[in-house]
Amino acid sequence: MRAAFQSSEGFSMIKNDKAWIGDLLGGPLMSRESRVIAELLLTDPDEQTWQEQIVGHNILQASSPNTAKRYAATIRLRLNTLDKSAWTLIAEGSERERQQLLFVALMLHSPVVKDFLAEVVNDLRRQFKEKLPGNSWNEFVNSQVRLHPVLASYSDSSIAKMGNNLVKALAEAGYVDTPRRRNLQAVYLLPETQAVLQRLGQQDLISILEGKR
């Protein structure tokens, strides 16, 4: 960490930066795993039960205990931005409901995703562009370093992984057709998704999620 940020004000800035990024490194939407975690959260498990289910029973079908714990921690952090009614939709609703709500959770836990959607994806659509350029994430990061200096503390590989996770999440939520082709697509929120945002006091996100802002 650079000396310029060693003051208490600097530490606050770095802390806020970390909150802006959230756990984007943790993965894209992880729909199947998130459904399983939502089901578990709805049982209000204590820590022992949580560990038994995640590690002992390997309910995420992960390749190792550490991978299971890492995925579970990331998903729980994201789902905790929602309410129990949203968890029920993620656990029992349609795939489209689940993906829209998981994208909302990702945005709430990693506000960098909201900014990328508003400033890059939606701007491209306003310009009637057809594709999300392959370098759009790196250009966005470069444009944000002064405002969010913690970005400079991440390795190139970590920045690239964040970008890959973000593009995969955009594809899962329908904003691009595939992570490889990146053809831009319109997204219309389901009534259930809009209701969750209203309940959470996040109705301002509706216009961003639908590309109107």
Curated annotation (Swiss-Prot):
Could you confirm whether the keyword Cell membrane appears in this record? no
Answer whether the UniProt record assigns the keyword Isomerase to this protein.
Answer: no
Q: Which GO terms describe its biological process?
A: defense response to virus
- Mind telling me which Gene3D superfamilies this protein's record contains? uncharacterized protein from magnetospirillum magneticum domain
Q: What happens when the gene is disrupted?
A: No visible phenotype, host DNA is methylated on fifth position of 5'-GGTAAG-3' in chromosomal DNA, BREX still confers phage resistance.
Signal peptide interval = none
Q: What induces it?
A: Transcribed at slowly increasing levels as cells progress from lag to exponential to stationary phase.
Keyword annotations:
Antiviral defense
Q: Which InterPro entries match?
A: BrxA, BrxA_sf
Which top-level group of life is the source organism from? Bacteria
Q: Which family does it belong to?
A: Belongs to the BrxA family.
What functional role does this protein have?
A: BREX systems (bacteriophage exclusion) provide immunity against bacteriophage. A probably non-essential part of a type 1 BREX system which protects against dsDNA phage. This system allows phage adsorption but prevents phage DNA replication, without degradation of the phage DNA. Methylation of bacterial DNA by PglX guides self/non-self discrimination.
Report the protein name in the record. BREX protein BrxA
Organism of provenance = Escherichia coli O9:H4 (strain HS)
Give the source lineage, highest ranks first: Bacteria, Pseudomonadati, Pseudomonadota, Gammaproteobacteria, Enterobacterales
